[in-house]
């Protein structure tokens, strides 16, 4: 796991499609202050074009695909023209309907909006997101922001009506033809989605053409081109973005109906209708979806060509070239009078990413007696050329025309990302007697992003396996397959470009009309950077029993990364935000187990049951000199962060803890009745999973099959700022404790005419803890406090009550399929199948309240932090597949 990675680097497994790396860049994701998920590259791959997927694990895969694959490779092979028929047509259609999966369930319906147990006068605007008012009373009437007087009653599930039923349709047509040694396959897919959020939709159209042929049995040619067009309207803002509709709705008082906001989001002049005291961080979600719109368009071109010359039966030479070119435009608009953007704003982001990959290989295979051997030598050129331009326009003067010309103030920022890696590599493969195998590789990369002297690095690998079932001639009925394997690999990796020296850019400001330039670096250049080094070792055992009806695959691995390239924060007086250094050491150890079984097999019925399990320990052994922690991501409030902490597992959640005595009891301030917290930040949890697992099952009876996929993740923690908000605003059920007693005490105080400072409360919330006595001993705390004051204090001081074990068990998918019998359709069709599909239908177990446990800022450094999560979706639908 790297301590630092850029948006252009991939900390996950590398995707390779038909031998060509995929540009899986994410153009945007949520963070501390919000953001948008702008998608990635792999989502553009058409599932109907995929023939197979396989995984090359760990750094051993880097020998083939370079340092970009240091975390493994997902190999995707796409379909060619079918050789079964000279001409074939396939139609595939899927329609699903989406509904909310997660809802706000832990909600109290005893008290409504307001503060201090009261609702002030008839004006509700300043408490619409607070649930600390009086008890529900149908006899109490309030005049709301829209001028309508309504009774003070609970509106159950008051935010659910905001979400609608979504729908997704995907239609694919495939045409393929084969003649002699030539095949052509063409695919067109149309996908359209109407999201559960109002006024939100997307479409994606994909055209794929692949042709392959053999000339004179000597030359193999394989060409493929794919074009994808994607359009999205109103991607939802995430996390703490002011336009995040989920964040703005989740604390809405239970006596407040969201549909009032729908009917009154703007006034007669088209201006923002103030409903909550013009809170710039809690906007009317209907204004957001209609007047703070965004839209994006993306064009993706992928092309590849393979030319292979078969010199003779032993030697072949091949060249593969590929390109992945992406053009994306994202436009975000805020109409005038939008809180925070009163004069209006338009921001247009233009991304132009180009990735090129060329590979040449000479492959020789032969045998001598019982030996089989092969030698491969080759070279690779990998080049990235990305450009970004962001235009921000402010002060709108022509409100009816959403275009740059309608704004008087414009600012342009541009960015360039270019890098190139040239590689040479070779491999030797030996086999003896079909039971002993030995492979060795050596690869050298020359990176443009590292300094001279350190920009060329070698990394070797060696692996071996012993097929003992073949060597010992074990009874094939009992043990048809048994193999042990071992491997060792070393891999180096580079960093982003422009880290070695100063770079410059045009300043958005000018002097007397003349353009100014400025230093573009925000990180102190480091001309002595070295490549990161990772050493890994792996042992494995593969077994198959009882005529292959039981299969077991066990892997133990260890991996140590050193010379990590770390980005450390610097003081503002340096003129930079950070500096890059080589430091740090992280050690991974883990096991992976896969069990594949067929418990039942008869003539008409079979049952397949597959189970997988993985456990990983990711220990931070060492950081830099004098550095004990390295921040990965920070939360919005109270100095909570996810970090790499020396001596701890990667992904520690740090924050202030309750101050405790030696017995572990919470120490309470005797004067206020509120708990004390530590001055320093402490490890309160960890964002990484202790273990993960999955279960797939498939029942087949003749032409009917029923399959299900279960997902299990255990042991990670998450700091839920949504829960923090729910407690702070009095919406959670747990905030009921002490309210009745405190409000009764306050009535007694008011009747007695005593000031609050001179009154000893007779009821309220009592913190479970101790107070320190003058002699240093501790006594039980018995002081009553206002529950509203208590939860506001907790929300502002410590994250401890809002850090949850994020373990869960989910049903990811259920499919019921029926394949029509041949005798019914053979005169017209080759095959027809119909299926019922349920995706993410329900969560069997989760511990975190109200939200989906998969909710995080993002899937990278933001794991372990959550705020304002949109409800996850469950979908039900059907699929029809017809082959001619």
Regions found by a protein language model. Name each.
Residues 13, 23-39, 72, 82-198, ...:
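Residues embedded in well-ordered regular secondary structure
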Residues 115, 161-162, 477, 619, ...:
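C-terminal beta-signal and adjacent terminal beta-strands/loops
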Residues 22-24, 59-64, 81-84, 97-100, ...:
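Short beta-strands and strand-coil junctions in structured, solvent-facing domains, enriched
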Residues 90-149, 581, 598-687, 718-782:
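Conserved small-residue
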Residues 133, 204, 210-219, 224-229, ...:
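Extracellular/periplasmic, surface-exposed regions of secreted and cell-surface proteins
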């Amino acid at each position: 796991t790297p301590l630092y990675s850029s948006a252009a680097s991939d900390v996950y497994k590398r995707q390779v499609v038909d031998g060509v790396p995929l540009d899986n860049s994410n153009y945007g994701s949520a963070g501390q202050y919000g953001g948008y998920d702008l998608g990635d590259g792999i989502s553009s791959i058409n599932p109907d074009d995929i023939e197979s997927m396989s995984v090359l694990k760990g750094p051993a895969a880097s020998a083939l695909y370079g340092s970009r694959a240091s975390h493994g490779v997902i190999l995707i092979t796409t379909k060619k023209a079918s050789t079964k028929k000279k001409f074939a047509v396939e139609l595939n259609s899927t329609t699903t309907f989406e509904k909310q999966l997660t809802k706000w369930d832990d909600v109290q319906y005893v008290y409504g909006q307001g503060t201090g147990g009261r609702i002030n006068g008839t004006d509700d605007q300043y408490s619409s997101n607070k649930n600390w008012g009086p008890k529900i009373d149908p006899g109490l009437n309030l005049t709301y922001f829209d001028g309508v007087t309504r009774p003070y009653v609970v509106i159950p599930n008051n935010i659910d009506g905001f979400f609608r039923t979504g729908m997704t349709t995907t239609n694919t047509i495939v045409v393929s033809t084969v003649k002699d040694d030539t095949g052509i396959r063409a695919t067109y897919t149309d996908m359209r989605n109407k999201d559960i959020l109002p006024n939100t939709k997307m479409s994606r159209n994909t055209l794929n053409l692949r042709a392959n042929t053999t000339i004179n049995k000597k030359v193999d040619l394989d060409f493929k081109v794919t074009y994808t067009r994607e359009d999205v309207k109103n991607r939802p803002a995430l996390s703490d973005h002011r336009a995040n509709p989920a964040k703005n709705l989740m604390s809405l008082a239970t006596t407040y109906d969201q549909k009032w906001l729908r009917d009154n989001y703007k006034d007669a002049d088209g201006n923002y209708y103030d409903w909550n005291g013009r809170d710039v961080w809690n906007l009317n979600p209907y204004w957001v979806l209609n007047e703070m719109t965004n839209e994006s368009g993306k064009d993706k071109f992928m092309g590849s060509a393979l030319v292979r010359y078969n010199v003779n039966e032993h030697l072949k030479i091949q060249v593969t070239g590929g390109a992945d070119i992406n053009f994306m435009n994202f436009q975000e608009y805020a109409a005038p009078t939008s809180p925070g953007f009163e004069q209006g704003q338009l921001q247009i982001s233009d991304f132009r990413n180009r990735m090129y990959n060329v590979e040449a290989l000479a492959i020789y295979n032969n045998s001598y007696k019982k030996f089989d051997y092969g030698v491969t030598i080759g070279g690779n050129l990998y080049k990235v050329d990305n450009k970004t331009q962001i235009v921000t326009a402010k002060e709108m003067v022509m409100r009816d025309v959403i275009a740059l010309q309608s704004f008087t103030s414009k600012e342009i920022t541009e960015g360039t990302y270019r890098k190139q890696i040239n590689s040479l590599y070779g491999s030797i493969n030996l086999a003896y007697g079909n039971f002993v195998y030995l492979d060795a590789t050596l690869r050298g990369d020359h990176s443009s992003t590292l300094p001279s002297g350190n920009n060329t690095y070698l990394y070797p690998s060696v692996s071996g396996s012993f097929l003992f079932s073949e060597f010992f001639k074990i009874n094939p009925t009992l043990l048809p397959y048994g193999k042990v394997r071992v491997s060792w690999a070393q891999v180096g990796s580079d960093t982003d470009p422009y880290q070695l020296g100063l770079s410059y850019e045009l300043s958005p400001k000018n002097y007397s009309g003349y353009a100014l330039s400025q230093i573009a670096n925000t990180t102190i250049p480091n001309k002595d950077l070295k490549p990161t080094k990772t050493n890994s070792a792996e042992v494995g055992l593969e077994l198959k029993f009882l005529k292959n009806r039981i299969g077991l695959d066990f892997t133990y691995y260890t991996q140590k990364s050193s010379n990590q390239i770390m980005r450390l924060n610097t003081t503002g007086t340096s003129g930079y935000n950070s500096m890059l250094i080589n430091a740090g050491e992280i050690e991974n150890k883990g096991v992976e187990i896969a069990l594949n079984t067929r418990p039942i097999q008869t003539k008409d019925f079979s049952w397949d049951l597959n189970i997988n399990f993985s456990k990983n320990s990711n220990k931070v052994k060492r950081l830099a000199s004098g550095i004990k922690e390295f921040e990965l991501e920070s939360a919005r409030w109270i100095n909570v962060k996810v970090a790499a902490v020396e001596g701890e597992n990667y992904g520690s959640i740090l924050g202030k803890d309750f101050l405790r005595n030696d017995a572990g009891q919470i120490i309470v301030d005797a004067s206020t009745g509120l708990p004390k917290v530590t001055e320093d930040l402490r490890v309160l949890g960890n964002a990484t999973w202790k273990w993960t697992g999955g279960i797939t099952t498939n029942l087949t009876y003749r032409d009917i099959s029923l399959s299900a996929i279960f997902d299990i993740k255990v042991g990670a923690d998450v700091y839920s700022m949504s829960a923090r908000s729910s407690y702070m605003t009095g919406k959670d059920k747990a905030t009921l404790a002490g309210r009745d007693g405190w409000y009764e005490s306050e009535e007694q105080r008011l009747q007695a005419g005593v000031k609050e400072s001179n009154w000893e409360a007779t009821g309220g919330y009592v913190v479970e803890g101790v107070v320190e006595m003058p002699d240093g001993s501790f006594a039980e705390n018995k002081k009553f406090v206002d529950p509203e004051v208590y939860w506001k204090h907790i929300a502002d001081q410590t994250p401890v009550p809002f850090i949850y074990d994020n373990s869960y068990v989910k049903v990811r998918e259920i499919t019921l399929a029926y394949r029509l019998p041949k005798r019914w359709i053979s005169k017209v069709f080759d095959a027809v199948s119909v299926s019922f599909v349920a995706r993410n239908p329900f969560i069997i177990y989760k511990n975190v309240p109200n939200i989906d446990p998969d909710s995080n800022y993002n899937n990278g450094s933001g794991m372990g932090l959550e705020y304002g999560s949109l409800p996850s979706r469950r979908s039900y639908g059907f699929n029809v597949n017809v082959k001619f």
